[in-house]
Amino acid sequence: MRIDVLSLFPDMFAPMRQSIIGKAIDKGALDFQVTDFRDFTENKHNNVDDYPFGGGAGMLLTPQPIFDAMASVEKQAGGKGRVILLDPAGRQFNHEVAQELATYDHLTFVAGHYEGYDERIRELVDDEISLGDYVLTGGELGAMVIIDATVRFLPEILGNAASAEGDSFEDGLLEFPQYTRPADFRGRMVPEVLTSGNHAKIAEWRLKESLRRTYLRRPDLLEKRQLTQQERDLLDNIKSEEQ
C-alpha cells in the first residue's frame, strides 16, 4: 500500500515512522510519503493562502500549490490514488471506514489549514472525512488517526489477524477485559475462569463481559446488533446483575 499526505507541516508525521507502521515501512509493505505543498507555490513569498472573494473571516488555501503537489504525487506514484480531504463537513470516520480504506492500494490525504479550502480544490477529491463534530487547527492530526486505524487492517501490519479482529468494534461489541501475569497482584485476582483451562467457559465469560462493557458504556452499539439467543440470555442476566 502507498499513502501520500499533502501537508504544510510534514515534520508532524515523523513519529508515524515508528512502531508498527515503521515496521511495515521497513518490510516494504507500506510506502509512506509526505509532501509539503508549500514547495509548489509560484509566488515569491511562498504564500499558500489568500482572502476569500466576497469577504469573510479567515484565509483560504489557494488551489495552485495543491493542484501542482497532487500532479507531482501522480507522476511519482503512477496515479494519485483515492484522494481524501480532511474536512469537518465530511462523513464521520469510524471502524467501518477504516476497513473500507484498507482495501485501496493507494491513498492520498490532503491536510489543510486556515479557514478552509478554495472550492476548486475539491475537484481533486474522491472522499471527504471528518473525525467528529469539532474543528481542529489543521488536518494533520485527523490524517494521522485515519492512517493509523486504516493500516492496522493490512495483513503485514499486526502479523496476527486475530489482533485486529478481536479489537473493540470488530464484531460490534466492546472488547472484554483482559489480564496477564501475575494471577494475584496485591490481592487483585484474575477471574478464576480464565485460569481454569475450560475453553468453552472462557469463551462464554468473554462474550458476557463484552456484552456487559458494551451495555454499560456504549448501549447504542447493542441497538445495531442482531443478538443471538445466547447473547439475549446473557444480556438479561447482566441487566439483573447491574441493577
UniProtKB/Swiss-Prot annotation:
S-adenosyl-L-methionine binds at residues 112, 131-136. It catalyses: guanosine(37) in tRNA + S-adenosyl-L-methionine = N(1)-methylguanosine(37) in tRNA + S-adenosyl-L-homocysteine + H(+). One of its GO terms (cellular component) is cytosol. One of its GO terms (molecular function) is tRNA (guanine(37)-N1)-methyltransferase activity. It comes from the Bacteria. Its EC number is 2.1.1.228. The keyword Cytoplasm applies. SUPFAM superfamilies: alpha/beta knot. Its main location: cytoplasm. Keywords: Cytoplasm, Methyltransferase, S-adenosyl-L-methionine, Transferase, tRNA processing. The keyword Cytoplasm applies. One of its GO terms (biological process) is tRNA N1-guanine methylation. Disulfide bonds: none annotated. It is found in: Cytoplasm. Gene3D superfamilies: 3.40.1280.10, tRNA(m1g37)methyltransferase, domain 2. Belongs to the RNA methyltransferase TrmD family. Homodimer. Specifically methylates guanosine-37 in various tRNAs. This is tRNA (guanine-N(1)-)-methyltransferase. The lineage of its organism: Bacteria, Bacillati, Bacillota, Bacilli, Lactobacillales.
